[in-house]
Amino acid sequence: MANTPVNYQLTRTANAIPEIFVGGTFAEIKQNLIEWLNGQNEFLDYDFEGSRLNVLCDLLAYNTLYIQQFGNAAVYESFMRTANLRSSVVQAAQDNGYLPTSKSAAQTEIMLTCTDALNRNYITIPRGTRFLAYAKDTSVNPYNFVSREDVIAIRDKNNQYFPRLKLAQGRIVRTEIIYDKLTPIIIYDKNIDRNQVKLYVDGAEWINWTRKSMVHAGSTSTIYYMRETIDGNTEFYFGEGEISVNASEGALTANYIGGLKPTQNSTIVIEYISTNGADANGAVGFSYADTLTNITVININENPNDDPDFVGADGGGDPEDIERIRELGTIKRETQQRCVTATDYDTFVSERFGSIIQAVQTFTDSTKPGYAFIAAKPKSGLYLTTVQREDIKNYLKDYNLAPITPSIISPNYLFIKTNLKVTYALNKLQESEQWLEGQIIDKIDRYYTEDVEIFNSSFAKSKMLTYVDDADHSVIGSSATIQMVREVQNFYKTPEAGIKYNNQIKDRSMESNTFSFNSGRKVVNPDTGLEEDVLYDVRIVSTDRDSKGIGKVIIGPFASGDVTENENIQPYTGNDFNKLANSDGRDKYYVIGEINYPADVIYWNIAKINLTSEKFEVQTIELYSDPTDDVIFTRDGSLIVFENDLRPQYLTIDLEPISQ
């Protein structure tokens, strides 16, 4: 009984195999091995260091270390959550039905003004017509752009043509091969844009089915698939259906799902765009760089829609990074190739349009059943183009449920107007003040990109200032005052739900920017002797709250007689608001709505004072308010953004040099 193991478990003896695999280095493993050998009778008092057996111990230790490292790496690289190599994460994601994004071409739409020497009724601008454009803030090394499709333009009465072309950055590459079912089809070009691929089999175009469900493909469907190889190249492959003829009916059949396989020795042509990716974002200054017979390009309009937020070519992107693949690859499997939940919509949009979408959130509205509202912010600018919206909507049609209609909308943007004061040591600044200001703006932009420009995220003034302090070693300290800004598209009347900041604001702090009012009166211009309309600036402001937390929304100042008064329309006589200083004695303010401070809701309707929208020469106004806290929160599809290129008025920087 004395030798019976406790609880009938084996106990370690002197000659038992040691736990030498616990060691993580060569020295530890070798030491554990020697200690184990010293415990055996054959090697008692044996000098391992001075013997030839030391070489064998080295060999065993190295072998154990290699096995340990390879085994550890193999286990880690087998799972998406623990893999370190991008190739391992990519292969695991593709097993879940997620194709990682390749480089994507920057795109834009332009309108040409052309003439034709033959004066034909219409002309055709073929796919692949070349143009050149320069990236933002550069005038060297222009980027190639090509038209994505054939465009037909009809001659107008002035014998001119105005084709609108969709351009993609890069060059069209055409590869032709003879199909061999034993040889993989691989494109060895890491600059390929997988969304701009066309594949032809014996002259007939086949359809890319990579992101679609195999359930919807028949055995004779002419489709193909793509996947990323271990070394980052792109492989094309087909289904396993082999064509045959039904002897009784004479119909073409196949005996396998997933699509048809080309016949042996078929001619396969692959056309794709090889692009520079994100480097070409913001490209402007387009010029015609091709030669079309009898066609002359007179002018190129880079912004045919007159978009005030035009940013040039955008949508260019680099290959998807490993962490994004790791996250979306797992979620994509849960979607089961259909859009049902809000997360499903977010995942599909992020997967396919990740190169142009920075943030996306899907939500529903109980008052509008049957719609899935998808708020998306592009990486460049603030608003998606009409073409981009339609592309997203059309892409989702294959995955959303029939009773649900996806609606692509812009987020409810909240801007933070920042008045920044930065103190720096004059003797430590090695560059100019202009350079330092640029560094500060870059740091603020980085803070917004990393922490703020995410739905349901928050802005903290203190955290932004830590980024500013890290802009350069010469910065001693910084301080800032902030205001929240809503851009109101319809200044005349607020939506039925009102305007919200989703944060508490201070009394009488809500003020709009000034905008022009046409009084309808005429005055003679002494310089020209001609009559002109009398115009002056007014603005919308709020008053202090009353005992119930309700304040008034008023507009002014108007000149006497410019607003027709009656028993329901009378000037506001209180002094609990910030008046707009003016030099012509205007002092008439009128109530047009109210502000509920505790509930954070603002309403107004200028029609209450019998003025029409034509009286105001403005479309969009900026509505400023002071928050009660330095931490700003968002919810319900609202998004805090920083776009200094498009909205420079929301940032002022005061640099104060100090000699030390």
From Swiss-Prot:
It is found in: Virion. Keywords: Viral baseplate protein, Viral release from host cell, Viral tail assembly, Viral tail protein, Virion. GO terms for molecular function: identical protein binding. Gene3D superfamilies: 3.30.300.200. Induction: Expressed in the late phase of the viral replicative cycle. One of its GO terms (biological process) is viral tail assembly. It holds the Pfam family Gp6-like_1st. It comes from the Viruses. Its main location: virion. One of its GO terms (cellular component) is virus tail, baseplate. Homodimer; each gp6 molecule in the ring interacts with its two neighbors, forming an N-terminal dimer with one and a C-terminal dimer with the other. Heterotrimer with gp7; gp6 is part of a (gp6)2-gp7 heterotrimeric molecule. The (gp6)2-gp7 heterotrimeric molecule further interacts with gp25 and gp53; the gp25-(gp6)2-gp7 module is involved in sheath contraction. Belongs to the T4likevirus baseplate wedge protein gp6 family. Baseplate protein that is located next to the tail tube (inner baseplate). Involved in the tail assembly. The gp25-(gp6)2-gp7 module is involved in sheath contraction. This is Baseplate wedge protein gp6. It comes from Enterobacteria phage T4. The lineage of its organism: Viruses, Duplodnaviria, Heunggongvirae, Uroviricota, Caudoviricetes. The gene is 6.
